[in-house]
Design a protein with these regions (language model features):
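Vicinal oxygen chelate
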Residues: 1, 7-16, 58-126
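Generic structural signal for beta-strand residues in well-ordered domains
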Residues: 1-4, 46, 59, 100
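Core segments of cupin and vicinal oxygen chelate
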Residues: 3-51
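Conserved short beta-strand elements that form part of the metal-binding/catalytic scaffold
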Residues: 31-64, 109, 115-123
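Glycine-rich loops and low-complexity Gly/Arg-rich segments
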Residues: 38-39, 68-70, 78-82, 92-93, ...
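Non-heme Fe(II)-dependent double-stranded beta-helix
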Residues: 47-50, 69-70, 96, 101
Length: 126
């Protein structure tokens, strides 16, 4: 059984011009826009997954997190163990954050460039 990251799951960005995001991702690329209840965040999907992109309004454009998917809980725990053994601080995501990202279980750490990495299992297809 594979015990590493299987695929890129989603990307999170802060953006200064949310209208431009709607134009590019919705009108030009034809992705489906999804609202986030109680938030200014907007998600876009391009396939069967709940979302692949998360955009939050901000004063500047910046990559804000990267979601990496694994194929099993066993693989998730193996990745987390390897990260911890390499000296990375890894924290388990709250149930609320897992619900927001539409994943079953997730852990977070910071990548070498300072961007938060989210390693998860159980992305929602809908």
């Amino acid at each position: 059984m594979k015990s590493g990251v299987a695929r890129l799951g989603y990307l999170g960005h802060t953006v200064a011009d949310m209208a431009a995001i709607d134009t590019i991702f919705g009108d030009v690329l034809g992705m489906q826009r999804r609202e986030v209840a109680g938030s200014q965040e907007v998600m876009y999907r391009m396939d069967g997954r709940h979302h692949r992109f998360v955009f939050s309004p901000a004063k500047s454009d910046q990559l804000s997190f990267i979601g990496w998917e694994v194929d099993s809980l066993q693989a998730l725990r193996a990745v987390v163990e390897r990260l911890k053994n390499s000296g990375k601080e890894v924290t388990k995501a709250s149930p609320d954050l897992c619900l927001l990202r539409s994943v079953f279980e997730m852990y977070r750490c910071t990548g070498p460039d300072g961007v938060p990495l989210e390693i998860y299992f159980g992305g929602v297809d809908d």
